[in-house]
């Protein structure tokens, strides 16, 4: 495949240091997929609010990723951007805000993520009304699902289409739903929808067990990895740090150490994009080789780390893999 202008630009200019690491990681990703391998992408930080979906959705459609792990915030915020985009407010001078300015944003029901404010009413509450019906229907029937399965039900219901404010092709959740790829969401409770669900449980309107939790999520991931790690194996492309990376990478040592499935393949490719620097006790900032000692990566797995802003780096790597 002949590369497009973005790929040609970074290949020509990104020759050394962190820039070269970006190219190496992109070429490694492409080689793994071209050889028949599969890829997990993990999303930490505020990648959905950063509108990574513009490139990630195409990665999903083009079969460059087979499974995603993300925080509960990233699961919901892509859909929030889909239905409330025009109500978001950008605050480019956010560093100059006083505590009173921040309070005024709250009073206006705007929740800030760096330079972007998410509108409570149009984003959170708009989803709440529709997702509650889906939770309640499952609860009444005694059915139980993982967090992403409920979100897929919401998207497939068509209830949100009346609110769409961006081109649907730029929503990675819609692309994932159309492909029906699994999404691992560890710690879903730490999200707006997780908090809202909890409030209904406290009020006695829903049962906590209706949404499957962390142990069942790990079991689901174990079954998926067992079924998909043959051949060229599964790669691990980690965007930012935190639980979205920490949780899924542990499935490998759990399978061969705790389950004693000694034929379990290790991750076949590893890349992390993070601005968390190496420091004493920092897991997110640890170099990939540290993971060898935990049985997550073998010595011969291609390993890359790009220490930079993921909102800049990830779209460039995706562009290279897509041939843009």
Residue positions per predicted region:
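Ligand-binding beta-strand-loop-alpha-helix segment within the catalytic cores
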Residues: 101-192
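Glycine-rich phosphate/diphosphate-binding loops that line cofactor/substrate pockets in enzymes
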Residues: 25-39, 175-179, 223-233
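Short gly/pro/ser/thr-enriched loop/turn and capping motifs at secondary-structure boundaries
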Residues: 74-78, 191-192, 277-280
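Short acidic, glycine/serine/threonine-rich loops at helix termini
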Residues: 51-54, 79-85, 195-199, 248-252, ...
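N-terminal glycine-rich anion-binding loop in soluble enzyme alpha/beta folds
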Residues: 1-26, 30-33
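Glycine-rich anion-binding loop/nest that anchors nucleotide
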Residues: 39-48, 68, 184-188, 208-283
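A generic, well-ordered mixed alpha/beta core segment in the N-terminal half of proteins
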Residues: 57-127
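C-terminal functional extensions of proteins
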Residues: 6, 17-20, 233, 243, ...
């Amino acid at each position: 495949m002949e590369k497009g202008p973005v790929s040609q630009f970074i290949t020509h200019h990104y020759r050394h240091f962190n820039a070269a690491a970006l190219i190496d990681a992109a070429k490694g990703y492409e080689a793994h997929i071209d050889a028949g391998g599969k890829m997990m992408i993990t999303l930490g930080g505020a990648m959905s609010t950063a509108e990574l979906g513009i490139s990630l959705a195409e990665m999903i459609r083009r079969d460059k990723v087979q499974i995603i792990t993300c925080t509960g915030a990233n699961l919901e915020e892509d859909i929030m951007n889909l239905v409330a985009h025009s109500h978001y407010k950008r605050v480019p001078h956010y560093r100059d805000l006083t505590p009173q300015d921040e309070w005024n944003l709250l009073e206006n029901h705007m929740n800030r993520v760096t330079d972007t404010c998410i509108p409570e009413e149009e984003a959170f509450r708009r989803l709440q009304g529709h997702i509650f019906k889906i939770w309640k229907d499952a609860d009444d029937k005694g059915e139980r699902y993982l967090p992403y399965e409920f979100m897929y039900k919401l998207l497939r219901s068509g209830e949100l289409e009346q609110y769409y404010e961006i081109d649907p092709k730029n929503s990675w959740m819609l692309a994932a739903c159309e492909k029906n790829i699994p999404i691992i969401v560890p710690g879903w409770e730490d999200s707006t929808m997780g908090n809202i669900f909890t409030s209904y449980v406290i009020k006695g309107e829903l049962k906590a067990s209706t949404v499957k939790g962390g142990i069942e999520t790990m079991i689901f991931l174990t079954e998926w990895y067992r079924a998909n790690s043959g051949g060229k194996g599964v790669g691990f492309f980690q965007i930012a740090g935190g639980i979205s990376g920490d949780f899924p990478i542990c499935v490998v040592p759990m399978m061969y150490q705790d389950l004693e499935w000694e034929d379990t393949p290790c991750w076949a490719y590893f890349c992390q994009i993070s601005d968390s620097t190496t420091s004493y006790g920092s897991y997110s900032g640890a170099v990939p080789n540290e993971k060898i000692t935990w049985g997550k990566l073998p010595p011969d797995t291609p390993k890359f780390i790009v220490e930079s802003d993921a909102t800049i780096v990830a779209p460039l790597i995706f562009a290279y893999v897509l041939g843009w």
